[in-house]
Amino acid sequence: MKKSIIITGGAGFIGSHVVRLFVNKYPDYRIINVDKLTYAGNLANLKDIEDQPNYRFVKADICDFDTIYALMQEEKVTGIIHLAAESHVDRSIKDPFTFARTNVMGTLSMLQAAKLYWESLPEKYEGKRFYHISTDEVYGALEMNHPEGIEPPFTTKASSHEHHLAYGDDFFYETTKYNPHSPYSASKA
């Protein structure tokens, strides 16, 4: 079976590197980049791969369950790498509702779409994977310096992290979480 992978947040800083890596390293995979193109998304990051035959960009909101579910059916998705998130600290203070909507409800939308679609297949979850890329902030601050725990901007990421763990335990054979710490590159300098 040919692999077909949705990468959410694929026009963002980390996501664009992941999309490029998969498009170039796995020419037999179908890579579907789903991004809402908010302040953090920039398709110019992917100009060099936009015409690759195994690449597709879909402008969509991960909170739009119907669109995500239909896309999974259309593309026969076998895996998800979920990077889409609100992460800008100043924005989280000004507009916590947007953070909660994207980070919690968007993650739930992705998890539920994957669950329902993969359950509908004869092979169910076999060979399917859901990777959730979060943040090291879900662990909170080290107690010796900051006993107050997780700072408000990161509570939504902690919630999405917990939803992923719960779905992984109850529904999926293969789930992986990754919580990077201070990603950096020359383009971010």
Annotate the PLM regions.
Residues M1-A189:
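N-terminal Rossmann-like NAD(P)+-binding domain of SDR-like oxidoreductases, especially those catalyzing
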